[in-house]
Amino acid sequence: MKINIIIVDKKGKDQLYAPLIEHYKKIAKPFAKVEVIELFDKEIAKAHDISPEAAQKSYTKAMEKYLSGAFNVALDPSSKELDSHQFAKLLKDRGVVNFYIGGAYGFESGFLTKCNQAVSFGKITLSHKLMKVVLLEQVFRGLSINHNHPYHK
């Protein structure tokens, strides 16, 4: 199984969260290969200066090339919240799962409709770097549930 976390975020290791990110990728390894793909380019930076709508379009353009051949899940605060067992079902029996974390302005509705599902981690706002860690923990928890690993107990 392959799990990709595709995020609008500047590339590079964050000294605070990088050890946690690597920790969750490592402990998930018996169940899945987990990769974090950070997307941020001049086009996204320029779009941020134009308007929220332009920014959303730039996120879609950067992310849509990852949509084919995977089960695609967008993180969207206005979507349905899942408990850990429901989240685990998203991962069950899938070859490739892509999770998308949008930029500061979220996703345009057209991108959300291209995804198989959109889920919410609640209405609070988290930094992108922290959301990466929270998502990785839930990915490992979901994999643990699916493989009867004691982590979730």
Q: What residue spans do the PLM features occupy?
A:
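Catalytic beta-strand/loop module used to bind and position nucleotide/cofactor moieties
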Residues: D76-S78, D83-G110, A118-L126
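N-terminal beta1-alpha1 ligand-phosphate binding loop
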Residues: M1-A28
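A structural signal for isolated positions on well-ordered beta-strands in alpha/beta enzyme cores
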Residues: K2-I6, E35-I37, N98
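Catalytic-core regions built around general acid/base machinery
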Residues: L20-I27, K89-R94, K114
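Conserved strand-to-helix beginnings and helix N-cap segments that scaffold or border functional pockets
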Residues: Y17-A18, S84-H85, L112, K132
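S-adenosyl-L-methionine/SAH cofactor-binding core of RNA-modifying enzymes
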Residues: K33-V96
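Structured adenosyl-cofactor binding patch, chiefly the S-adenosyl-L-methionine
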Residues: S109-K153
